[in-house]
Amino acid sequence: MEFFPIFLKLRHQRCLLVGGGEVALRKARLLLAAGASLQVVAPELAPELADLAERGELEHLPGRYAPALLDGMRLAVAATDDAEVNRAVAADAEARGILVNVVDDAEASRYISPAIIDRSPLMVAVASGGSVPVLARSIRARLESLIPAGYGRLARFGSSFRDAVKARFPDVDARRRFWETVLEGPLADAVMNGDEAAARAEMEKRIAAGGADRAGAVYLVGAGPGNPDLLTFRALRLMQQADVVLYDKLVAPELLELVRRDAERVYVGKARANHALPQDDINQLLVDLARQGKRVLRLKGGDPFTFGRGGEEIATLAEHGIAFEVVPGITSASGAAAYAGIPLTHRDYAQSVTFVTGHKQDGSIDLDWQALTRPQQTVVVYMGVSTAAELCQAFVDNGRAASTPAAAVEWATTERQRTVCGTLAALPGLMASHGIASPALIIVGEVVELADKLSWYRRSENSAVTIQED
């Protein structure tokens, strides 16, 4: 380990910054954010540094660097464009026992500045030992997306109860277990969402109860159309916190790999006419698991409120007083259309888009065909693979031309994606001959003509295939 990671308390400590350019400005911002009493030595200052000096946030020492300026300093930063000056600052600081950083010169530095994720009082630092700063910044950018701003609020909330928790749980292990239950789950969500009053009341209740009766919750999460890169940050965080996950056939296997490793997995089916669990049983299972104090992830393909029966599930949760949260996902229609190069609306082709389901109810496809066959619109059919022939014929029987462009997109947004494009007359045969199976969507409308020109997604030579009618 080349550098020992520490955090310095610099509030009201004297620090010297040598240099007045843009690089020095970046260092000044960090030092001021830490509360340092900052002096900047340089003949001239960049405009923003000069503005900070005018406002009294730092002191400008006009002129050139001299060793005596280091006297009484706690920390020094050399940020000029002159390597000799920077090295002189480093040598003089070393001689006085002052921590010194030389920008872009780890060898001359006694300390380096890491890439920082600031969720004060929570701080995360990432460093590459000064060898590849760009890599550290890249990792910081990834972590930024996984650590919401609300974590700072959560850290302050926890700090305010630290003494009370320590008094209630003298045993270190018991205290740790208590904090683990508090810092993940509904109480933490309430804090991060700004409902601190409710969180405080719940926290006081839990402390008084000795941490018993951990409250469970259900997270209804849209997993998107299949590509893990299309998950929302919130969805990913909840997937990695869940104690148990209920998933169905429409959730891509790649997405399940992102669920917490030790989470219990419950397959609930939902394939056409082959449900591992009936919907009522799924609803009740969500209630039962939450009542056991578990964080339950109900993971659904696409968006839970678009033909996902999410409304039925949370209605049951609400009836039983179970805490729940809904995380929207990219609905399959949006994902499939975008990755197949088929705009759902287009000024020249379609002024509206309609989503329908191709599932039969009471033995027939009960849709408003008069509305669906109007010109200048796109119709997207969910769950229509098994009824494709009937659907396409119904479009024609109700007024759409048999030559109307139509497409089916299978396993949209994944490497297994296949798109077959044809017409209402030809599509069922194309789907059958190419073995198109669920999960797949059918898109009907003139916008399908654009797929030949706008199809862009192809991970490799053999993935994301587009098949056009001969």
From Swiss-Prot:
Its EC number is 2.1.1.107, 1.3.1.76, 4.99.1.4. The modification Phosphoserine is found at S128. S-adenosyl-L-methionine binds at P225, G301, G302, D303, M383, A412. Keywords: Cobalamin biosynthesis, Lyase, Methyltransferase, Multifunctional enzyme, NAD, Oxidoreductase, Phosphoprotein, Porphyrin biosynthesis, S-adenosyl-L-methionine, Transferase. Residues 1-203 are annotated as: Precorrin-2 dehydrogenase /sirohydrochlorin ferrochelatase. GO terms for biological process: cobalamin biosynthetic process; methylation; siroheme biosynthetic process. It comes from the Bacteria. NAD(+) binds at E22, V23, P43, E44. Pathway: Cofactor biosynthesis; adenosylcobalamin biosynthesis; precorrin-2 from uroporphyrinogen III: step 1/1; Cofactor biosynthesis; adenosylcobalamin biosynthesis; sirohydrochlorin from precorrin-2: step 1/1; Porphyrin-containing compound metabolism; siroheme biosynthesis; precorrin-2 from uroporphyrinogen III: step 1/1; Porphyrin-containing compound metabolism; siroheme biosynthesis; siroheme from sirohydrochlorin: step 1/1. The keyword NAD applies. It catalyses: uroporphyrinogen III + 2 S-adenosyl-L-methionine = precorrin-2 + 2 S-adenosyl-L-homocysteine + H(+); precorrin-2 + NAD(+) = sirohydrochlorin + NADH + 2 H(+); siroheme + 2 H(+) = sirohydrochlorin + Fe(2+). The active site is at D248, K270. GO terms for molecular function: NAD binding; precorrin-2 dehydrogenase activity; sirohydrochlorin ferrochelatase activity; uroporphyrin-III C-methyltransferase activity. SUPFAM superfamilies: NAD(P)-binding Rossmann-fold domains, Siroheme synthase middle domains-like, Tetrapyrrole methylase. InterPro entries: 4pyrrol_Mease (IPR000878), 4pyrrol_Methylase_sf (IPR035996), 4pyrrole_Mease_sub1 (IPR014777), 4pyrrole_Mease_sub2 (IPR014776), CobA/CysG_C (IPR006366), NAD(P)-bd_dom_sf (IPR036291), Siro_Cobalamin_biosynth (IPR050161), Sirohaem_synt_dimer_dom_sf (IPR037115). Residues 216-470 are annotated as: Uroporphyrinogen-III C-methyltransferase. Then it catalyzes the NAD-dependent ring dehydrogenation of precorrin-2 to yield sirohydrochlorin. Finally, it catalyzes the ferrochelation of sirohydrochlorin to yield siroheme. In the N-terminal section; belongs to the precorrin-2 dehydrogenase / sirohydrochlorin ferrochelatase family. This is Siroheme synthase. It comes from Chromobacterium violaceum (strain ATCC 12472 / DSM 30191 / JCM 1249 / CCUG 213 / NBRC 12614 / NCIMB 9131 / NCTC 9757 / MK).
